[in-house]
A protein has these predicted regions:
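Ribokinase/PfkB-type carbohydrate-kinase core domain
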Residues: 24, 33-48, 52-55, 59-169
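Glycine-rich phosphate/adenosyl-contacting loop at the front of the ribokinase-like
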Residues: 1-20, 30-31
Length: 169
């Protein structure tokens, strides 16, 4: 997902970081764990043995660079507050939250626990709105999240316009 890609990109550029997320105890989960750790990213979450398999995504790109994603969120939707490593968050300068995971109640609890832990440690919280459809589904909750917790907001123009329900910004 975008959070894993973000931290992998940061690590590839020489930055340090950790990732909190769910993978299944399957081949894709093992490959993900190996690859992200090979970049130097801390990823200590135990694989799950219950529920759906590790997430996958097929990305189709047209010659004019338009893209369509066919995504199965898989095990990552089972992220919950028990998965949040507060020590890892306290050691981080910025905690990055991905809006795509806001659909599940357990993920919301994990987000809030992570944001609380970051602020208690004097750290910053960032949020990616992810896409306009995600914003439309969660507008009121995202507005509250931004007001109460978010120090850095990542969004494109369409996402910001959707969040604040305005024609321009």
């Amino acid at each position: 997902g975008s959070a894993a890609n973000t931290i992998a990109g940061l690590a590839s550029l020489g930055g340090a970081g950790g990732f909190i997320g769910k993978v299944h105890d399957d081949q894709l989960g093992e490959v993900f764990r190996h690859d992200i750790q090979a970049l130097g990213v801390v990823f200590d979450c135990a694989p799950t043995t219950d529920g759906p398999s590790t997430a996958t995504s097929m990305i189709l790109v047209t010659p004019d660079a338009q893209r369509t994603m066919l995504t199965f969120l898989g095990a990552c939707v089972d992220l919950g507050p028990d998965d949040v490593d507060e020590d890892l968050i306290a050691a981080s300068k910025i905690t990055y939250l991905e809006g795509y995971l806001w659909d599940r109640p357990s993920a919301k609890e994990a987000f809030l626990k992570a944001a609380d832990a970051a602020h208690r440690a004097g750290r910053k919280v960032s949020l990616s709105l992810s896409d306009p459809f995600c914003v439309e589904r969660h507008r009121d909750e995202f507005l509250d999240l931004v007001e109460r917790y978010v120090d850095i907001l990542f969004a494109n123009e369409e996402e910001i316009l959707s969040l604040y329900q305005t024609g321009d910004f």
